[in-house]
């Protein structure tokens, strides 16, 4: 992601970014968390739902307000577990044509087995000893493990892999099949990754020339209220549990 940003800036593009962790953080206020505390698999479903709704609307607003052809927007969209998975779902709103357009590309990296193991080790290290303020808010290593278990379970449920494979350790084939399903409504490119650039610094160091989209307190209040009016907690939970059905 950082390399993409760096290259884009060097080519004269004005880059904006929307990241799940930063977008979600705006919704994790003391008052909201008191009402909707974390659950066993992470952030409360209603908060995830609200953050995703804000994300699509923020993108729609950016597209409307941005007229300079040198501007571009990059999204960090984890998807697994309903983390900005709204961006891959075909929805009847004003931003869907742009998301489905050939001008929008969803890039998903596929690490090799050995690289995946190294990434897990790096996450354990940065989580235990954060060297950047945002690393302290990174998901714990157990979230990476949960994401893989979810990938296998949902891939098996969809018939993409066998039941026996659903208990497999990380396997590139499973990862690719699942993401091909998730991104079937999007212009998607797979990139195989087998190298870690050890001197690349923190993944959160984006550079001074990158502008980040964040939800304002008023936006947070409005979106939370809208989701509360439209869904009970049980309904929001069921909706979030179906994040992989696109």
Where on the chain are the PLM-derived regions?
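Conserved nucleotide-sensing/catalytic segment adjacent to the nucleotide-binding pocket
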Residues: 10-86
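Glycine-rich phosphate-binding P-loop
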Residues: 1-7
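Noncatalytic linker/hinge segments flanking ATPase motor cores
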Residues: 57-61, 111-123, 145-155
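ATP-dependent NMP and nucleoside kinases share a basic, alpha-helical "lid"
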Residues: 77-140
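Well-ordered, non-membrane alpha-helical segments in soluble/globular domains
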Residues: 45-60, 86-95, 134-145, 175-176
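A conserved mid-domain beta-alpha-beta active-site/ligand-binding segment of alpha/beta enzyme cores
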Residues: 127-202
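A generic structural signal for well-ordered alpha-helical segments
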Residues: 8-10, 99
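C-terminal accessory extensions appended to soluble enzyme cores
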Residues: 169, 174-246
